């Protein structure tokens, strides 16, 4: 399966294109279920979406959001959590109320039961209409890490040492002890997927993705099995690559 690959001039143009696509999907389907990744790459996209709230208030009024993943063992909404970032840049600015938001608690008393709750809610609320993803340095998608096998549904994840170096955690005194993440089958069940890849530091994982080799040791490669996904990357990430 060949993916539509769009190479943008820079991170700003990538974010503008991504925001335009998310907005079009939202206007086309009020009540859309958006799966939102945290991290630095999608933040500008969310900021640009927030600028459109007044103009498209009716569409945003019914928007539903599911959090893609979360760092386990950190206080909910604490420094470095996905919850904190999404609340600041997406949920708050877009006026997404608690009734229209589904997210892992970062420090549940029973992580397995928390994942079971998310699985049940996603069955009830899903499938995901549009999933916004980033590309991990080791090829992880959400917190689905390279492994001999991948989990299909929401689960407790063992985090790779490279993942624990994520910039989101740089200012957090506490470090996560596990991950909470949607599974690959839930991600691939999305009606549409946007993969955002920005920066020269993502050049190597993008090169591996473009091999078109599907392997559990590089979870992002499973996106090649999806019939409606788009790779948006900037020139810094795509430099020297054959994106055919």
PLM features per residue range, with description:
Residues 1-2, 58-132:
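Ligand-binding beta-strand-loop-alpha-helix segment within the catalytic cores
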Residues 1-34:
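N-terminal glycine-/serine-/threonine-rich phosphate-binding loop
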Residues 28-55:
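Glycine-rich N-terminal segment of FAD-binding domains in flavoprotein oxidoreductases
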Residues 36-41, 133-137, 198:
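Glycine-rich beta-strand-to-loop/alpha-helix junction loops that act as flexible
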Residues 48-59, 84, 146-156, 214:
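A glycine- and small-aliphatic-rich helix-loop capping segment at beta-alpha/alpha-beta transitions
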Residues 113-115, 142-147, 152-154, 205-209, ...:
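A short secondary-structure junction signal
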Residues 138-184:
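Class I SAM-dependent methyltransferase SAM-binding "motif I" and its flanking Rossmann-like core
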Residues 185, 189-244:
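ATP/nucleoside-binding phosphotransfer catalytic cores, i.e., glycine-rich phosphate-binding loops
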């Amino acid at each position: 399966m060949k993916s539509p690959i769009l190479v943008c001039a820079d991170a700003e143009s990538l974010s503008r294109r991504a925001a335009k696509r998310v907005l079009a999907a939202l206007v086309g389907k009020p009540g859309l279920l958006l799966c939102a990744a945290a991290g630095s790459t999608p933040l500008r996209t969310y900021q640009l979406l927030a600028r459109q709230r007044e103009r498209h208030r009716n569409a945003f009024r019914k928007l539903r959001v599911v959090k893609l993943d979360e760092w386990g063992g950190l206080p909910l909404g604490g420094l470095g959590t996905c919850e904190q970032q999404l609340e600041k840049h997406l949920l708050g600015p877009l006026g997404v109320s608690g009734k229209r938001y589904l997210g892992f608690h970062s420090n549940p008393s029973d992580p397995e039961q928390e994942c079971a709750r998310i699985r049940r809610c996603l069955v009830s609320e899903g499938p995901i209409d549009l999933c916004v993803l980033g590309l991990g340095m080791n090829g992880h998608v959400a917190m689905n890490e390279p492994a001999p096998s991948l989990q299909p549904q929401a689960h407790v994840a063992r985090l790779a040492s490279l993942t624990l170096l994520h910039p989101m955690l740089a200012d957090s005194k506490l470090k996560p002890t596990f991950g909470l993440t949607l599974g690959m089958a839930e991600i691939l069940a999305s009606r549409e997927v946007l993969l955002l890849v920005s920066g020269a530091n993502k050049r190597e994982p993008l090169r591996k993705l473009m091999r078109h080799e599907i392997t559990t040791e590089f979870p992002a490669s499973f996106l090649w099995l999806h019939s409606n996904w788009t790779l948006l990357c900037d020139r810094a990430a795509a430099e020297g690559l054959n994106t055919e």
